[in-house]
Amino acid sequence: MISSDYIKDKILEIENIQGNLIRSRISEFKRLKKSDKYTLFKELSFCILTANTSAELGLKCQAYINDGFYRLDYNDLREELIKVHYRFYNKRASYIIGARDIIDDLEYIVNMDDHFRAREILIERVKGIGYKEASHFLRNVGVFDFAILDKHIIKFMKNNYYIKYENNSSRRRYLENEIVFNELAKKFNMEPGVFDLYIWYIETGKILK
């Protein structure tokens, strides 16, 4: 296990190199929380698309499709995903079309005081959304209670013996791993959704969203 001093030193190093970008990203997330329902839905669609793919591909899809996430019918959305070489074009197009039922409630959900209930609502109502994707969406709209426990974060935790298993698929395992990560974030006086950005940079060398 790497020491707390090592992580602290890495955080300071990242702050010196990428501090401005991280603060800019955090401000962007906070601004997004105040957006209209259609902008929020585009972010939700991005989070649906990043599951089992890469953030880079999700960003490419988001930039290319844009308003099409809530305007296009299934066939047209599917074709647009094919154009950007998105692998799961059938299933994810279906998920995004189905998720439109929640558009009118998104502004309410992202501003709920009970962030954990907000996450459960997303999971219950949006097919294709699990704990990781719901946490991703909420973090990206300025709810920093949640980190995104993707393969990079889980790898960091497993390799440094904070957790025993890389399997993160079940509800129980995800929430157990989340508790461990949140306790680690607390040691460094950071919100999980901010600490996540630093650990992700340690693992990937990138600051995305």
From Swiss-Prot:
This protein's record includes keyword 4Fe-4S: no
Site (described: Important for guanine/8-oxoguanine distinction): K209
Keywords noted in UniProt: DNA damage, DNA repair, Glycosidase, Hydrolase, Lyase, Multifunctional enzyme
Listed Pfam families: Ogg-HhH
Catalytic activity: 2'-deoxyribonucleotide-(2'-deoxyribose 5'-phosphate)-2'-deoxyribonucleotide-DNA = a 3'-end 2'-deoxyribonucleotide-(2,3-dehydro-2,3-deoxyribose 5'-phosphate)-DNA + a 5'-end 5'-phospho-2'-deoxyribonucleoside-DNA + H(+)
GO BP terms, alphabetized: base-excision repair
DNA damage listed as a keyword: yes
Entry annotation: catalytic residues: K132, D150
GO molecular function, one term: hydrolase activity, hydrolyzing N-glycosyl compounds
Residue ranges the record marks as coiled coil: none
SMART domains linked to this entry: ENDO3c
Entry's EC annotation: 3.2.2.-, 4.2.99.18
Alphabetical list of HAMAP family matching this protein: Ogg
Family listed: Belongs to the type-2 OGG1 family.
Function: Catalyzes the excision of an oxidatively damaged form of guanine (7,8-dihydro-8-oxoguanine = 8-oxoG) from DNA. Also cleaves the DNA backbone at apurinic/apyrimidinic sites (AP sites).
Protein name: 8-oxoguanine DNA glycosylase/AP lyase
Lineage, top ranks: Archaea, Methanobacteriati, Thermoplasmatota, Thermoplasmata, Thermoplasmatales
The gene coding this protein: ogg
